[in-house]
Amino acid sequence: MPSTDLLKLKDFEPYLEILEAYSTKAKNYVNGYCTKYEPWQLIAGSVLCTLLVVWVYELIFQPESLWSRFKNKLFRLIRKMPFIGRKIQQQLTKAKKDLVKNMPFLKLDKDYVKTLPAQGLSTAEVLERLKEYSSMDVFWQEGKASGAVYSGEPKLTELLVQAYGEFTWSNPLHPDIFPGLRKLEAEIVRMTCSLFNGGPDSCGCVTSGGTESILMACKAYRDLALEKGIKTPEIVAPESAHAAFDKAAHYFGMKIVRVAQKKNMEVDVRAMKRAISRNTAMLVCSAPQFPHGVIDPIPEVAKLAVKYKIPFHVDACLGGFLIVFMEKAGYPLEKPFDFRVKGVTSISADTHKYGYAPKGSSVVMYSNEKYRKYQFFVDADWQGGIYASPSIAGSRPGGIIAACWAALMHFGENGYVEATKQIIKTARFLKSELENIKNIFILGDPQLSVIALGSNDFDIYRLSNMMSAKGWNFNYLQFPRSIHFCITLVHTRKRVAIQFLKDIRESVTQIMKNPKAKTTGMGAIYGMAQATIDRKMVAEISSVFLDSLYSTDPVTQGNQMNGSPKPR
């Protein structure tokens, strides 16, 4: 009795005969058509067709989308048109001048030092000069600056200065010369991994800041993806994820795929799932994200990471040293965010923010050394010997590492819990009061220290301008148009929060007398930037800001940056 498989095969025999007949007919047609061409023509045609296919493929499949490249090309052509180009250039020049006018930090009444002094200055003279420079700063001690300075407590400052002085000349590039410094750095990493519930295999590195921590994680996953055969590794990140991920994509030849947010400003997990492709090198969430202070749904995204076997980075640069103490401070978070979540493979956390270490220190952590090894750079063939570096920099300031260690040891768990309690208490108070102020609203549901404000009744940038006139400093946000304020230990001091709310209420009341009035100053510049379709023009204008940071040209005296200048 014939088997079932043979019976099934016989059922397809008529179809196979038809297929064979058509293939023979097609073959004969092609052979007949090609008889009028010489062999060299067929070879040349094949080569040209192959080159054309490769060219079309490379044209379409690039890190920058075809639509984006088309728009950029179109805008470049428009700017070259005689009349339109001149008009655009005039507006561009005006925007640059307006930007410079609104850079108060350029308006100093002191001459710039442009050459070395012929005779070196004494210690007293150098310190006196430095006091002159520090007197130009905003008087942030009043608590009117958003973020920027996270403690500033005099006794802590004294400790950090002494710790830095102890290791001023040390460099972790030479662990054989500075073994004590190596021990300090290793202990910083281990303490931080423990705070984020890393297991015995967890590891990390100390970096110069949040951006470098993010860059290092992206570099590690880029190299891992390349090893797997992915030619253009992709970073799948929320729209709200830090711009350092764009920087990493730019530096490392990656492509960033931005994923939409929901109305509550959390990343849309379904949209993130749709964004995953065979080129995805890493997934990203924030805890919290910088613009609105909202924590992304980390456990849900972690499930995607596990399902598709993709590394998953949690960016906790801003609030890392708050979220780990929230539960003990009496403000437990609804969802886990650290290495307890299966699928989380790396975390970045800034010690120089709510860790209260001096600027220039952060930690990037990995769940396992198998990820960290891709972060390292090793050149085994250099004439100067085998060169190995854990992060971007070669030489690094040992003083910063020592001061970071000193801050961690000085605060201890109890100190951080108490600081977190004060900050979150102040933030929750401000949040509850701001929710009751008419004509403004809070974006999302911030659980930590950042509160973003918007308005449906007036240009929210006007509120920032008006608060600036009262000495306050806000951060401008875009898409959607909004502003935010970041609460630190400085803002927990007596009456700072009360004064903040008083000035907000007064400013909103004043604005609502003429809600449609034109926005001026930096608010107008940000408004213009958000409305500009050609983003290359916005980048060109922004470069003026960067150029100005290195300007040594004298500018007429004016006010300092948003905030109260120090008394002279």
From Swiss-Prot:
CDD domains: DOPA_deC_like. Residues 1-41 are lumenal. Keywords: Acetylation, Apoptosis, Endoplasmic reticulum, Lipid metabolism, Lyase, Membrane, Nitration, Phosphoprotein, Pyridoxal phosphate, Signal-anchor, Sphingolipid metabolism, Transmembrane, Transmembrane helix. The chain crosses the membrane at residues 42-62. It is found in: Endoplasmic reticulum membrane. One of its GO terms (molecular function) is pyridoxal phosphate binding. The modification N6-(pyridoxal phosphate)lysine is found at residue 353. Its cofactor is pyridoxal 5'-phosphate. Pfam families: Pyridoxal_deC. This is Sphingosine-1-phosphate lyase 1. The modification N6-acetyllysine is found at residue 353. Residues 63-568 are cytoplasmic. Pathway: Lipid metabolism; sphingolipid metabolism. Belongs to the group II decarboxylase family. Sphingosine-1-phosphate lyase subfamily. It is a single-pass type III membrane protein. Its main location: endoplasmic reticulum.
